[in-house]
A protein has these predicted regions:
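Flexible, D/E/H-enriched segments
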Residues: 142-149
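Helix-loop module immediately N-terminal to the HCX5R catalytic loop
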Residues: 82-90
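Active-site-adjacent alpha-helix immediately C-terminal to a catalytic or transition-state-stabilizing loop
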Residues: 89-142
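Active-site-proximal alpha-helix that buttresses catalytic centers in soluble enzyme cores
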Residues: 1-83, 118-130, 147
Length: 149
């Protein structure tokens, strides 16, 4: 579960919030994710279609030659408890079937719904921070928190 990297401040952005890009430090955070995601053999890259989320996962996607899976249900505008739970449940089922790692990149206001769907307390991730969730038979057995660099 990935919170997008550091983006430009809302207060200084004049356009559509979905188009708000990463700051330079956020772009560095995105590149720093490449070896971390590779260590977990992440192959499914699900993300909010907001530019800041896309830019967070693009360096890794390009490294492994994978496409980003755009998930409207995890945008700030569209997220509901039911929709997010359905997305998370689908990812967990896919992980159980494929045995391949996945990442879900989203926004601070959506993260509590993601963690609730996993049966976890919201750890209040900082920009660029992630929680690796280890599953066994579809149940959470351990978590690891990775701070941004």
């Amino acid at each position: 579960v990935q919170r997008h990297a550091r983006a430009r401040a809302r207060s200084t952005w004049r356009g559509d919030d979905r188009e708000r890009p990463l700051q330079q430090v956020g772009r560095s955070q995105a590149f720093d994710l490449v070896p971390v995601l590779a260590a977990y053999d992440v192959r499914r890259l699900a993300t909010s279609p907001a530019v800041r989320c896309l830019e967070t996962l693009t360096p890794y996607a390009e490294t492994i030659g994978a496409d980003l899976e755009l998930v409207e249900e995890v945008t700030e505008e569209a997220a509901t408890e039911g929709a997010v739970t359905k997305v998370v449940t689908g990812l967990v089922e896919d992980l159980h079937t494929t045995r391949r790692g996945a990442v879900l990149c989203t926004h601070r206001p959506v993260l509590p719904l993601v963690f609730e769907a996993l049966g976890l307390d919201d750890p209040a991730l900082a920009p660029g921070e992630m929680v690796v969730v280890h599953l066994r038979k579809g149940r959470v057995v351990a978590t690891e928190r990775h701070l941004p660099h």
